[in-house]
Amino acid sequence: MSLLKRLCLLVGLLVAAALIYLLLAPTKIDPVAWQPPAAPSLTGPYQQNSRLSSIQRLSLGEGREPEDVALDNAGRIYGGFNDGRIMQLQADGSQPRLFADTHGRPLGLVFDSQQNLVVADALKGLLSINPNGDITTLASEADGAPFGCLNDLDVAADGTIYFTEASNKFPMKEFTSDILEHRPNGRLLAYDPNTHKSRTILRGIHFANGVAVSPDQSFVLVNETGKYRVLRVWLSGPREGQSEVFVDNLPGFPDGISSNGKDKFWLALVTPRNKVLDLVLPHPFLRKMIYRLPKFLQPKPQRYSFVIALDTNGHVVENLQDPSANCFAEIANVVERDGTLYFGSIGESAVGRFSLH
């Protein structure tokens, strides 16, 4: 056999092996079919614009992916790196210093009424950090089972902590697996500071993400990233305990959400909808093939800056974007303080600041 024929045979065998792998190799995911609604165009309430092109970057020091951002009563700024460190900045954005180290993955950050920083840590559970940086574990399980991947949280006026478990199957480093599988592996929980117990509020969420309690404390919002929507769970009144869709068919993946304490919820769309993902969501077999591809060949999130504000009825009242994302990209959380927005990100090493005036 000539050298050329041998090479052709070798290439053919390699191609056949690759096809067999893509078609038949076992996977961790067990996807189900879902037909997503057609993505809304970037017109009308989502009209494309470049208002976020002037975001100011505030360096936290050496580190990556400060997903959430929180401010204490003195205006100091906090962000959590992916290696467990939570950094603090002065109110003017200067003097980064280590505030605490969870040795986990701090994702959700919010201050309670006593100025303790409450943390949803994907690896360590629900934590409380006092102003001196001392860490206390509030909870690591609910309903007799340890937490999966905790994601975000908010604290109600009565001290109840509402928080999400993004997935009880996949760790945060494999969050794309949960999105590809598209099973309702997430839930919303509540921690009672009086009993020190956690309980499940809502199950069956497709990648449970951001959490925000309404200004009047009558409901809590939870982002369902896998279905491009925000859910509302009533906490009081005649519909107490019931859930409903608050806003549906978003133009991007909803990540963090926060209340401004008055009349708005700020919602971070971490990246626009992915056309390839929307095309394969109805086809579990194709999603298994994508899962088997090397990471560098799998669909990637688009670098984009996208934040909207919703009123208490779920209507879009603010629309801030930057398609170039030259200043700041992949905004994962947004907090308003005195007419200024502060951003966390899964694609940056800094937090962001933007004046609304």
Whereabouts are the PLM-identified features?
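Sequence-structural signature of mature extracellular/luminal beta-sheet repeat domains
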Residues: 2-357
